[in-house]
A protein has these predicted regions:
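Inhibitory N-terminal propeptides of secreted protease zymogens
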Residues: 19-157
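C-terminal outer-membrane/trafficking sorting elements
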Residues: 6, 11, 493-503, 507-581
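Bacterial Sec-dependent N-terminal signal peptides
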Residues: 1-21
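Active-site-adjacent substrate-recognition loops and nearby beta-strands
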Residues: 286-289, 313-321, 348-371, 375-398, ...
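Short acidic, glycine-rich surface-loop motifs adjacent to enzyme active sites
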Residues: 296-325, 349
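Hydrolase catalytic cores
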Residues: 271-277, 302, 405-470
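N-terminal domain-start motif of subtilase-like serine proteases
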Residues: 20-37, 106-109, 119, 123-124, ...
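Subtilisin-like serine protease catalytic core
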Residues: 18, 36-38, 56-57, 135, ...
Length: 581
């Protein structure tokens, strides 16, 4: 039988006189007492430093992180400190020496300067005697708490931010997904032409089955990795788990199939990380989740969405308690906060543990001070009974924000046109908020995670009176976007080619098209039908750097959805527009 453990190696130097048992954490030492001679344990081995050969990485930053990651970090870090010690790889010499003592490597963590893997008690004691080994600790494992289903008849109405919008003619036919989107004013933002274009989102879940589903037909997936099995296939097909949960969360944030389901950020780019083995009683192993987050950072993601939330461990492991929800105890919380410091907007489910009058019911890493903890409301705006509550042990308000998580309309993995509204949980509300964040970042890519957090809080339904049931309330994406559009400086030279928006949208018969270029450029804008077939050129001119606009006349066009594609020498951007006569 294998048991899970984590060997931890930090940057602090080790004295020669330190006892090897001093390097073994109390939790691991207790596990040693319950372990047989040949029983393998899953542990982290943490190192004292990263060795001497580190200068090369600071001189050539792209050897450890992508250009996109460096650009994102420039929003929050000084130019001379875009690469940190935590970006440097774990010392390969150290790894090989540990392997020579019998250690079987599972994951590597450059942020925590350690490796996880399997070894016996005696092998671990031998490893602890190495001078450059700092600490050995267990790898924590988590269960997932699923929401208790509620009555679908929802008479509880706390807020309706768009009372007339359900009868409005929108740019797209949202089908049954309109209600969950309308609650957080997503259709109004789509009507402005924003779809999440240019934003990269990392989805971390238990796998993503049936990516051939019709709702993913136009999704741009740029990278995938299975951190459970160590391969790029994130669809399960019976491979250590069931990926139906990931299918649903991915459809909620970025699916697109008119008349059925549209996600907030269907125009974004996605990377998919499988981090959970649902065939296990404790499917979430923290080393997989941390490795996925580091991978996402190195690629250059802007937003992460994950439904991880702790619960009690199986014996002989100890679990976290509500008293550990202080933002500084759980390793996954520490990792999530570090990601935010690197410029990533980290969105996490608050948890499905409901209300307790005596203490919080949060799950790590939602307790992080920089992590956006998302709770759940019903379609009428009332808090879902299963939605976890704060405050954190150190007194901070949690959750941060709310969106619908009760009976959302999602894609399912039974067949390629399968949809369902039977599920509930903060796993559903989390991708709704993450998708809204992507829309806002499309409007202003220079927003830092904390600026984006404050913007969402300040425009939410309880912005002036937050509490530990709803946080700052149900997000109002349109209000957040409008607050940015009213403060845009048209004299600022843009950093990238962007079609900002068309307004009004839908239109009849004319609409204003606005775009921007960073340098003098030859710009062509071409009208296509919804299938991508070219219809006519509507703009072609040499323009100076800055903001430009023109009026598109649709008098000769039929009602429907069209694509506008802007082309320059090296860049192309596309938006959807809707003509309603």
């Amino acid at each position: 039988m294998r048991v899970l453990i984590f060997s931890f190696i930090t940057f602090i130097s080790i004295s020669f006189g330190q006892s090897s048992m001093d390097k073994v954490t109390h939790q691991l030492d207790r596990l040693f007492d319950q372990t047989g001679p040949g029983e393998e344990l899953l542990v982290w081995v943490f190192f004292a430093d990263k060795g001497d050969a580190t200068r090369q990485y600071f001189e050539k930053p792209t050897t450890v992180v992508s250009e996109k990651s460096l650009k994102r970090r420039a929003k929050v870090l000084s130019e001379d400190k875009l690469v940190l010690q935590t970006d440097l790889p774990v010392n390969q010499f150290y790894i090989e020496k540990v392997q020579a003592l019998g250690f079987k490597v599972k994951q590597k963590s450059k942020w925590f300067n350690g490796i996880s893997g399997w070894a016996t008690k005696q092998e671990l004691l031998n490893i602890s005697q190495l001078q450059y080994v700092k600490e050995l600790d267990i790898v924590y494992k988590f269960k997932k708490e699923y929401a208790v289903e509620e009555d679908k008849e929802d008479n509880q109405t706390k807020i309706n931010q768009n009372p007339n919008n359900l009868n409005k003619i929108n740019s797209f036919n949202y089908g049954p997904s309109l209600t969950q989107l309308n609650l957080i004013t997503i259709p109004d933002v789509h009507d402005l032409g924003y779809t999440g274009a240019g934003v990269t989102i990392c989805m971390m879940d238990a796998g993503f089955d049936l990516l051939s589903h019709q709702v993913f037909g136009s999704m741009n997936i740029i990278a995938t990795w299975d951190f459970v099995n160590g391969d790029p296939n994130v669809e399960n097909h019976g491979d250590l788990g069931n990926g139906s949960h990931g299918t649903s969360t991915l459809s909620l944030i970025g699916g697109f199939y008119e008349g059925q389901l549209i996600g907030p950020a269907f125009g974004a780019d996605f990377i998919l990380a499988k981090t959970e083995n649902t065939e296990s009683e404790t499917p979430v192993e923290e080393d997989n989740w941390i490795a996925a987050l580091e991978w996402a950072d190195s690629i250059g993601v802007d937003v992460t969405s994950t439904s991880l939330s702790y619960t009690d461990f199986d014996p002989p492991y100890q679990g976290y308690t509500w008293q550990d929800m202080d933002g500084n105890t759980a390793r996954i919380t520490i990792g999530a906060d570090l990601a935010v410091k690197l410029g990533i907007f980290v969105v996490n489910s608050a948890g499905n543990y409901g209300y307790d009058p005596n203490h919080n019911t949060l799950g790590a890493p939602a307790d992080g001070d920089s992590v956006i903890a998302v709770g759940s409301v019903t379609s009428g705006g009332g808090r879902s009974s299963f939605s976890s509550v704060g405050p954190t042990v150190d007194g901070r308000i949690k959750p941060d924000l709310m969106a619908q998580g009760s009976y959302n309309y999602v894609a399912c993995n039974w067949f390629t046109s399968c949809y369902s509204d039977n599920g509930s949980g903060t796993s559903w509300s989390c991708p709704m908020v993450a998708g809204a964040a992507a829309l806002i970042l499309e409007v202003d890519p220079n927003l830092t995670p904390m600026e984006l957090r404050d913007l969402l809080r300040n425009t939410a339904s309880q912005s002036t009176n937050p509490d530990n049931l709803y946080g700052w309330g149900i997000i109002n994406t349109y209000a957040a976007v409008q607050s940015l559009l009213t403060t845009v400086d048209d004299n600022v030279v843009p950093e990238d080619f962007v079609i900002l928006r068309n307004y009004p949208n839908p239109f009849n018969p004319t609409t204003k098209i606005q775009f921007e270029v960073p340098v003098q450029s030859d710009v062509r804008i071409i009208l296509h039908d919804v299938l991508g077939r070219e219809m006519k050129e509507v703009f072609h001119n040499e323009v100076k750097a800055g903001m430009h606009e023109f009026i598109l006349d649709g008098s000769e066009l039929s009602s429907g959805v069209y694509l506008l594609r802007m082309l320059t020498e090296n860049i192309q951007k596309t938006i959807k527009i809707s003509l309603l006569k």
